């Protein structure tokens, strides 16, 4: 209650600061299905556009997210291996991932970003910090919103084809690599446009896209990765633009193979009993409808469905099959751009119901019935965005989540920003987040409390025609963290607590002759706290939790830069990223220091044909340019150099 009172007082003072000289801003887009408008938001947000994706030289979503300050991105081995993201010191299962409006985290909160191809993405929105007031449960460390290409009002065709090779390191002491070359190729096609271009009563647009990746890996043993993605969508606008319906469907099939023993260890050939295979089928569907009942106000209904089937096979006894289904129903009333002489208001109130089911397949193993569950979370929420004379802004959200077994939680979120001039914005805020226990954790511990986080931040953004700078200072804490302990009962308990603070910096220099430098830097301090009982100090996972010691896999310093140059039809960029030293674990009770490393990449394209109707270019991209051997995660050697050459064609008419 004291926190709420303080926030109300801050907001009251803040509203009085709004001055009358209006600053002309471009029309900002909304973030996700909220009232937040990008350019006016007081929180830490990074938007990655389609053009930035195409010219980044990135092979995966993980490569793109490494450029976001505050995120520590780590990958286990080669392409297809698990990509974990630690946002501002939080755990890797504290990131809420939303794709085309569908929440897509695995049971327990984890998400492998490697299963997403980047060829059909229109934009990526990254909100750092807890955001439960706007997005609900699981939004502890960050919210990552991925928008694939949408139906368009004119015919558009996009084609991409590329091929190349992975070059492994010279033969090492455990025989995982031999300096060989392994083939990789990718293709993508997208077609969108109107279905009834000349109709005045109803407008229908469509999109259909397909992508595939075939990567033979980088080691002697088979560690190949295959990925296929099919997306489709339809937009309908009718009744004088009052009725809007959008539906999206996505099917993804991914297989990754990696040489491990049945216990998961990677070692010399003699110790590897076989190649493990992880197969996924992910299907998501969504329909979003809204109807304008009065001017600037509408009723809406969203439905989303997510299915995740996983099969893991190896030559040992570790075969596992499981599936998960999520259905979300969201009903809301929304007001947009309601204004008087002083304030412009956007507001939304709603009710959301999430039904979640998962189970092991009946014939999978002796664990066939251990983890089956069917549970729900129902939520009521409200959010409001206030615009004071186009100079000061407030985004406020509050949400009550009620879990069938783990209780109710209220979570407020407040962010404020003010433009001191057309170039300088000051911002800051307070936010909370929760994550309810996953089914694995609750099998023998039904009384667990949700994990909770709380964060404060303050920052500034400055931009003119020559350079841009963004600076954020933050401080956060996470409580009731759920940990596994091999001794005692139940196995999972609310034991761990953590604190973090840091500075995030990013910016851009625009030099002469279309030369630019983009940069980002993160300084992060983390520590475990209140580790003062024998359960934690003498049990499994103690390596990760030592009192007043840094958390694992979170470097204190990290950053990078991209230098790009355009000359006539030629575009070239070179990137360098730095990951500082960090602690990792050798086993459940022993931690080791993992050394820092640099990663270099190169991208170039040549526009050989372009007019008002189409554009064609060839491109080349190289990752791990100098074929440096490193370990992003201890005991997992990262892949060597990858070089790709390709062709891209885009047309519109």
How should these model regions be labeled?
Residues 192-198, 202-204, 211, 235-239, ...:
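Conserved C-terminal beta-signal and adjacent last beta-strands/turns
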Residues 246-250, 289-294, 342-346, 352-356, ...:
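Structural signature of Gram-negative outer-membrane beta-barrels, strongest in the C-terminal barrel
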Residues 23-26, 62, 66-103:
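Extracytoplasmic beta-strand/coil segments of soluble accessory domains associated
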Residues 178-257, 276-299, 339-341:
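Transmembrane beta-barrel wall of Gram-negative outer-membrane proteins
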